[in-house]
Every structure is written in structure tokens, then in C-alpha cells.
């Protein structure tokens, strides 16, 4: 059995790490490179860096941040936000990232998934899914809809359909974020996570809502996630990655030991 991965997520805006609740009221919490180094030294398995306004602002990729991170940490990291073309993917990977995450761009142009997988390998392509709970309908039978542009734009895409389609197109991994749970620290959306994790054959990273180590244990066991994204619970010093991993190990969840 593969070890479950613990992945800090750094939302970046104008070159600074920020954190909000449900993608709103973001506050500055530090330099992304310094924070990346700290989490690397703490025992993170990977790190995710998202430029949270690059797509909505139609800006370029934060390549300067990517290059500085690559010189500082020695674990895999992925980059998302503002990646719209194969050239963007190539630039990010050449700057030092192991993976690229596409979200809004993939909804608008699904072929970018297959093109990226063919050019760089599926292992490099992460589909970011921002999901909101809605009333089930003929169009969205799962009751979960894909939203883009930082949660501001609905798509009419059913989350389960989109996950299966992305897998078919060649995505190597899914990062599944619940907009409803994001930043609340009330726990992950377990039903959503289990629905996607048990329907696709590629790894699923659960995102949105982590507040305690118990929440991670729940999403990794009950939600069947392969990895858990964390932000607020470590950004504000409430828990350390070492403490989280020790808790998971004590509760029978296999993790990479870094203590």
C-alpha cells in the first residue's frame, strides 16, 4: 500500500502567500518561497503553489516564484494558475516544477489535458477541480458542479462526469477542492471525495476544510483520498506537519515518516 501524502497548499497573489475563506477575504501570510522551505523542512511530501488570480486577471505565470522555489526545496511541487497552453506548461516544468495543475483552462479547452499528457507524460498533469454543492438535476446528477475563475463562474459541468472525462483525456491526478469547505477548518467534504476517489483510477488529492488531524484521517480513510491538501491548519501554526503525520501513523494510516 502506498503511503498517504500530506501536501501544504500555498495560495499566491501578487507574489505573496494569502489565505481566505471560500476564496474570499484573503489576507497576506508570508513569502511563498520561505514558507515552502519551512514546510519542506517540516516533512511535507509535496507542495502545491496556486496563483489564485492569474486566470481571472488573465496574467502570466509566476515563473520567478517557481524558479526560486526550485532552488530551495527538494521534494516534488506543482504549480497552478494562469497555465493555458502547452508553452505555459513547458515553461513551468523547465523552471523546476514536477507537475502543472490546470483548472479553468481545462474546462475551456479540455484538449489541453491530452496535449499536455502526450507532450510531458500524464504524471505531470494535475486536474484542479473546484466544486460547489448544488441541487441534483438532469444536467448535474451528482449534485456537485464545477466552478472556475476562483469559484466565481459556474460551468454546468457535473463534477463526477468531469473527473471521468479528465482521466480519459490523460490527467495523471486530480486535486479535488470543495469551495463550500475551503478555509472553514470544519472538515473535508467526505461524500464528494469518496464519490470521485472510488470512481476514477488515478490518485485523488482532497482539498478544502482541513482543521484538525482527525479531519485528515477521515478523508484518507472514509473519503478514500490518496493525499490530503492542508493550508489554514498549518499556515497559522495550529499544527505542525510532523504532529499531523505522527497522529495519522498512530491511527494506522501509512505515511512517509519524517520524524
Swiss-Prot record:
Entries under InterPro entries matching the protein: Aldolase_TIM, His_biosynth, HisF, IGPS_HisA/HisF, RibuloseP-bd_barrel
CDD domains in the record: HisF (cd04731)
One of the record's GO cellular component terms: cytoplasm
Pathway: Amino-acid biosynthesis; L-histidine biosynthesis; L-histidine from 5-phospho-alpha-D-ribose 1-diphosphate: step 5/9
Ribosomal protein among keywords: no
Keywords: Amino-acid biosynthesis, Cytoplasm, Histidine biosynthesis, Lyase
Active site: 11, 130
The keyword Amino-acid biosynthesis is assigned to this record: yes
EC number(s) given by UniProt: 4.3.2.10
NCBIfam families: hisF
Subunit architecture: Heterodimer of HisH and HisF.
Protein's job: IGPS catalyzes the conversion of PRFAR and glutamine to IGP, AICAR and glutamate. The HisF subunit catalyzes the cyclization activity that produces IGP and AICAR from PRFAR using the ammonia provided by the HisH subunit.
Entry similarity comment: Belongs to the HisA/HisF family.
Protein name: Imidazole glycerol phosphate synthase subunit HisF
Amino acid at each position: 500500500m502506498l503511503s498517504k501524502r500530506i501536501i501544504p497548499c500555498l495560495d499566491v497573489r501578487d507574489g505573496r502567500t494569502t489565505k481566505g475563506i471560500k476564496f474570499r477575504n484573503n489576507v497576506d501570510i508570508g513569502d511563498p518561497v520561505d514558507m515552502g522551505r519551512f514546510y519542506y523542512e517540516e516533512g511535507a511530501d509535496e507542495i502545491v503553489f496556486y496563483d489564485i488570480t492569474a486566470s481571472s486577471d488573465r496574467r502570466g505565470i509566476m515563473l520567478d516564484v517557481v524558479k526560486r522555489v526550485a532552488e530551495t526545496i527538494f521534494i516534488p511541487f506543482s504549480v497552478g494558475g494562469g497555465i493555458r497552453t502547452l508553452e505555459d506548461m513547458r515553461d513551468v516544468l523547465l523552471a523546476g516544477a514536477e507537475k502543472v495543475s490546470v483548472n479553468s483552462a481545462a474546462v475551456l479547452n479540455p484538449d489541453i489535458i491530452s496535449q499536455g499528457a502526450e507532450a510531458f507524460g500524464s504524471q505531470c498533469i494535475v486536474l484542479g477541480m473546484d466544486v460547489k454543492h448544488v441541487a441534483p438535476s438532469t444536467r448535474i446528477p451528482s449534485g456537485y458542479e464545477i466552478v472556475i475563475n476562483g469559484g466565481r463562474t459556474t460551468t454546468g459541468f457535473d463534477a463526477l462526469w468531469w473527473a471521468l472525462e479528465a482521466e480519459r483525456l490523460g490527467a495523471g491526478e486530480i486535486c479535488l477542492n470543495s469551495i463550500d469547505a475551503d478555509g472553514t477548518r470544519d472538515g473535508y467534504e467526505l461524500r464528494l471525495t469518496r464519490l470521485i476517489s472510488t470512481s476514477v483510477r488515478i490518485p485523488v488529492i482532497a482539498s478544502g476544510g482541513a482543521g484538525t488531524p482527525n479531519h485528515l484521517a477521515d478523508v484518507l480513510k472514509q473519503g478514500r483520498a490518496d493525499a490530503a491538501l492542508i493550508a489554514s491548519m498549518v499556515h497559522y501554526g495550529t499544527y505542525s506537519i510532523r504532529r499531523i503525520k505522527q497522529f495519522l501513523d498512530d491511527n494506522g494510516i501509512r505515511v512517509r515518516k519524517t520524524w
